[in-house]
Design a protein with these regions (language model features):
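Short, acidic Ser/Thr/Gly-rich low-complexity loop/linker segments typical of extracellular
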Residues: 52-63
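Short, acidic, small-residue-rich periplasmic hinge/interaction motif at the N-terminus
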Residues: 11-22, 32-34, 40, 45-50, ...
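Surface-exposed extracellular loop regions of Gram-negative outer-membrane beta-barrel proteins
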Residues: 361-362, 408-419, 461-484, 508, ...
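Periplasmic N-terminal accessory/gating domains of Gram-negative outer-membrane beta-barrel systems
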Residues: 83, 95, 117-177, 182-216, ...
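Face-selective signature of the C-terminal outer-membrane beta-barrel domain
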Residues: 302-319, 331-478, 570-578, 612, ...
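C-terminal beta-signal and adjacent terminal beta-strands/loops
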Residues: 524, 581-582, 675, 684-702, ...
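Outer membrane beta-barrel strand-and-loop segments of large Gram-negative receptors
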Residues: 381-385, 426, 430, 434-436, ...
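Gram-negative outer-membrane beta-barrel transporters
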Residues: 577-580, 599-694, 785
Length: 788
């Protein structure tokens, strides 16, 4: 019989199990490692059982598992920033026990920056996985003084963006909609505020971020390029506390505390911006007339009902309002809520049930002249799933489950405003269901070999009511070739697709500090964003697979070599990847995508490929840390002419909108003293592809008509930028209130990075190119942060 005892001090002996119980060959000790002050789980803590070679590292909720025979041991637990914990164990049977760590107390003066001796990059089975803790993100120089998940993510190998003000991020050259973004299980369709300058994730509530860009576990699906899984931390179940910050552009606040001490907690956070005063001081008249505002609210509650049952709920709401001069206004909002129930059965089975629902709405207002109007589109979803985790033996793990998404899309509604002459128009709602079953196996074959193999089967159905247009066979789809239509009733299946998605990863350890990893995964995408702009905008519509539009499919391959030096103080890797895409969606030249009742006439089907090399180097030495990553990648597309569609670029391969061959990030951090630090980040990338006029002809000596190049044959200027930050604090560490002050400078050397290029031509003169720089100047900021 297992016996769970209360926490003991380090000087006492901890007796686990019953001394008169039936002896077993192998005993199991499970539990969690927590912060003694606030009860927060500590992921990444290292447990070592002396005098054996038994080790474990806590997972995201602080859980661990150690297997040992009956005996007397010394358990050592260590984690960066905490006092090392040692306690003597007398183990007689299976047991469950939680251990508490205390923050490390350091006198003012020089401090050495060290990483926990973590060889997870070498020993983990998955390739192409990046984990970002909030501590790592806080070490980077910040835009307007605030830690930001998406900006930190863009310092990772293989991750780029279209430029300043871009909505989302691109992984290995993929589109922004090809990333599955989850926040505590909630689907996120637009992850940014202020048209891309801030992410919607409240930084003081984030526990950690994991990006899967190569090896993707079978429990994830629905996107071609990557999975971004953002986990929010649980509230303090020991005492009431709070933290926040006040900056020149936004402020934030988090409050947390126990609902029932040691059993249930809450945490709530809010952010709001006030950047209008900055716009009022701009040189541009249009900018002085502009307005920008956003807010977000996030709440989370967790409770342990019993030793084996836990429930939780997360909810968030965001709103953005941006008006450019007296011409156009954007509004977009997200609201979502998620519930989970976890049940431990015995010591080897963990069951989880989840349910969440959400909505994303965007509005575009034309506020100029006699054509004032409001364009609206909306996405609603309902999502649920069950999964089970089973570990029959120490070296084998099995996870299986099922989930379903139900989508309702309102692709567009146009309404006149203030008595304008705009003609109302509305597109009918679209509905679809996506049902998946998955099986995930992970097996430690030997000390040198670990294998992960999984399979995911997904079925998609597009549902009525819907009127499907039928086109003349053997010719391209146009409005002129419509011949008939089919009418489907409410809930009737209009189209269905399904497919198997195998997942495979292999790790072979070469030495104690090096390994080789192989990875393969297939993914289907049944829900895609329709946008032919340089960067997705809040009003771009999302399109379900249907009678005419097939799901996209990607096969991802990767191989990596991982090598650490000096007991993991230096970490390096080299990864090669290749992606093959089928049924890729592209667009005709000058395609009309908004309020199009037959959007399939503007779409083209092709194939794509992406390939590249990622190089990473990280070194901690003394008070300094240096990180470098470089990516070489190409992302190409091909749309060939056929009897049913036109081609692009004569059927040749051409660069995608996000093809940026070279990307380099350099990050430096200096812990000057315990209460002061300096950081600097430099980023460089090749300019995005663009299409440009190469010649022109004059009609009637009056009208000059430009002739454009093939698609994406030119590039805008290269992007590069240097940011720095200096932080003083925290001070008041011995008191209840702790403070810090950060001075940051974004774009230190005033680089006018081009977001896009446009062309103008005066009569009888050559074409002139002009760059559009969203942030073409230096941006200093000061931020006051506090904790209590």
């Amino acid at each position: 019989m297992a016996l769970a005892l209360p926490a003991f001090s380090q000087q006492e002996v901890l007796v686990l199990g019953e001394t008169n119980g039936q002896p077993k060959e192998k005993l199991i000790l499970t539990g969690r490692v927590l912060d003694v002050k606030n009860g927060q789980p500590i992921p990444g803590a290292v447990l070592h059982l002396e005098p054996t070679d038994k080790n474990d590292v806590t997972n995201a909720d602080g859980s661990f598992k150690l297997v040992m025979p009956i005996g007397i041991y010394t358990l050592k637990i260590s984690f960066l920033g905490y006092e090392e914990y040692r306690i003597k164990l007398h183990v007689f049977g299976d047991a469950k026990h939680d251990f508490m760590l205390s923050e490390q107390t350091i006198e003012l003066g020089q401090v050495t920056v060290t990483e926990t001796k973590n060889d997870n990059n070498v020993t983990s089975v998955l390739t192409g996985v990046e984990s970002l803790s909030i501590e790592k993100m806080e070490r980077q120089a910040k835009f307007l003084g605030e830690t930001d998940v998406l900006r930190s993510l863009q310092s990772v190998t293989g991750v780029t963006s279209a430029g300043e003000g871009a909505s989302g991020f691109n992984v290995r050259g993929g589109n922004t909609d090809e990333n599955l973004i989850l926040m505590d299980g909630n689907l996120v369709f637009n992850p940014v505020h202020a048209l891309g300058f801030f992410s919607l994730f409240h930084p003081d509530m984030v526990q950690g971020v994991t990006l899967y860009k190569g090896g993707v576990p079978a429990k994830y699906g629905g996107r071609l390029s990557s999975v971004l899984d953002v986990k929010l931390r649980e509230g303090n179940d020991q005492q009431f506390s709070g933290q926040g910050g006040v900056g020149i552009a936004s402020s934030r606040l988090v409050l947390e505390g126990p609902i029932v001490k040691d059993k249930a907690s809450f945490i709530v956070g809010a952010r709001a911006s006030y950047v209008d005063w900055i716009l009022k001081r701009a040189k541009s008249v249009d900018l002085r007339k502009s307005q920008a505002f956003f807010y977000d609210l996030t709440a989370k509650a967790d409770a342990r009902l019993t030793e084996t049952t836990k429930i939780g709920f997360t909810a968030f709401s965001t709103h953005d309002d941006f008006r450019f001069a007296d011409e156009v206004k954007f509004e977009y909002a997200t609201s979502s809520g998620a519930f989970y129930l976890r049940q431990l059965i015995g010591k080897k089975i963990n069951l989880t049930a989840t349910a969440n629902t959400g909505q994303y709405t965007s509005n575009l207002f034309d506020i100029n002249g006699n054509d004032q109007s409001k364009f609206t589109n909306k996405i609603k979803y309902l999502r649920g799933g069950v999964s089970g985790f089973f570990q029959p033996v120490d070296k084998y793990q099995l996870e299986l489950g099922a989930d379903q998404n139900r989508y309702t899309v309102a692709p567009g509604k146009l309404a006149p405003q203030n008595g304008s002459n705009v003609k109302p128009d509305v597109l009918p709602d679209e509905m679809g269901t996506e049902t998946s079953f998955f099986l995930h196996n992970q097996w430690t074959v030997s000390k040198k070999v670990e294998l992960m193999a999984g399979i995911r089967y997904t079925m998609f159905k597009n549902l009525g009511p819907e009127r499907v247009l039928l086109y003349e066979e053997g010719v391209p789809k146009t409005e002129e070739t419509i011949q008939d239509s089919l009418q489907f009733a409410d809930g009737e299946k209009t189209a269905s697709y399904s497919g198997l998605e195998p997942r495979f990863s292999l790790r072979v350890t070469l030495t104690d500090a090096s390994s080789v990893k192989l990875g393969y995964n297939r993914s289907y995408q049944f829900f895609s964003q329709i946008s032919n702009t340089a960067s997705a905008t809040p009003i771009d519509i999302w399109q379900l697979s249907n009678y005419h539009i097939k799901p996209q499919r990607a096969d991802n391959y990767s191989v990596g070599y991982y090598q650490n030096f000096r007991e993991n103080a230096i970490q390096t890797y080299l990864t090669v990847f290749y992606r093959d895409i089928d049924q890729l969606i592209d667009y005709k030249d000058f395609a009309k995508l908004l309020l199009n009742h037959h959007i399939e006439t503007e779409l083209l089907t092709g194939k794509g490929k992406a390939y590249g090399v990622e190089l990473y180097f990280n070194k901690a030495y003394g008070q300094h840390r240096f990180e470098m990553n470089y990516t070489y990648s190409r992302t190409l597309r091909q749309v060939q002419e056929s009897e049913v569609q036109e081609g692009v670029s004569n059927g040749d391969w051409y660069p995608s909108n996000y093809d940026k061959p070279h990307s380099l990030n350099l990050n430096y951090f200096w812990q000057i003293k315990t209460n002061s630090s300096f950081s600097a980040n430099f980023t460089y990338s090749t300019g995005r592809p663009t299409t440009a006029p190469v010649s022109s002809f004059t009609s009637g000596n009056v009208l000059t008509i430009p002739i454009y190049s093939e698609r994406n044959q030119f590039r805008i200027p290269d992007y590069h930028r240097l940011d720095v930050a200096y932080t003083v604090g925290p001070w008041g560490k011995k008191e209840r209130w702790r403070n810090s002050l950060t001075l940051s400078i974004y774009n230190l050397y005033f680089r006018k990075n081009a977001f896009s290029v446009f062309f103008r031509q005066k009569p009888f003169q050559s074409v002139t190119a002009y760059r559009v720089a969203v942030l073409g100047s230096i941006f200093p900021a000061i931020t006051y942060d506090f904790k209590f």
